[in-house]
């Protein structure tokens, strides 16, 4: 059996993934970082992009798109705290474009500071998802 580690992916909306993985590849601020069981402790910021999860007994990697956040690595536990995150399978491009345009339109109007902050998060989420769909299309999905 391959060595494994625990991974928790959490966004402001809640837990997205919690389980055992063989490896994680994430878009860190200084470039992609590959994490395997026994990795040295690490704390880094994440850039927007795809996080690839290798799950035991699954033929294909699972992909989670993040808009940024933090990554904490311990030898056998990885915690990914994302501003916004979504699984690859949940992306629907048409809905995402509509959400993006709605958030942009509302941001142009005068709104309270709280509403503005919420809309910025929604816009970042929509942009991340649209980028994810575009990457999937380039990969032939």
Swiss-Prot record:
It is found in: Cell inner membrane. Its main location: membrane. It is a peripheral membrane protein. GO terms for cellular component: plasma membrane; proton-transporting ATP synthase complex. The keyword ATP-binding does not apply. Pfam families: ATP-synt_DE_N. Belongs to the ATPase epsilon chain family. Produces ATP from ADP in the presence of a proton gradient across the membrane. F-type ATPases have 2 components, CF(1) - the catalytic core - and CF(0) - the membrane proton channel. CF(1) has five subunits: alpha(3), beta(3), gamma(1), delta(1), epsilon(1). CF(0) has three main subunits: a, b and c. This is ATP synthase epsilon chain 1. It comes from Thiobacillus denitrificans (strain ATCC 25259 / T1). The gene is atpC1.
């Amino acid at each position: 059996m391959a060595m494994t580690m625990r991974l928790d992916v959490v966004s402001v909306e809640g837990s997205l993934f919690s389980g055992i993985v063989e490896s994680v590849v994430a878009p860190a601020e200084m470039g992609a970082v590959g994490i395997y069981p026994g990795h040295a402790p690490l704390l880094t910021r994440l850039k927007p992009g795809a996080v690839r999860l290798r799950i035991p007994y699954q033929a294909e990697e699972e992909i989670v798109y993040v808009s940024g956040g933090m990554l904490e690595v311990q030898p056998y536990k990885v915690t990914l705290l994302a501003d916004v995150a979504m699984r690859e399978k949940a992306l629907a491009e048409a809905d995402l474009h509509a959400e993006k345009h709605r958030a942009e339109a509302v941001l142009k109007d005068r709104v309270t500071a709280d509403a503005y902050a919420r809309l910025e998060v929604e816009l970042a989420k929509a942009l991340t998802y649209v980028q994810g769909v575009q990457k999937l299309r380039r990969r032939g999905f």
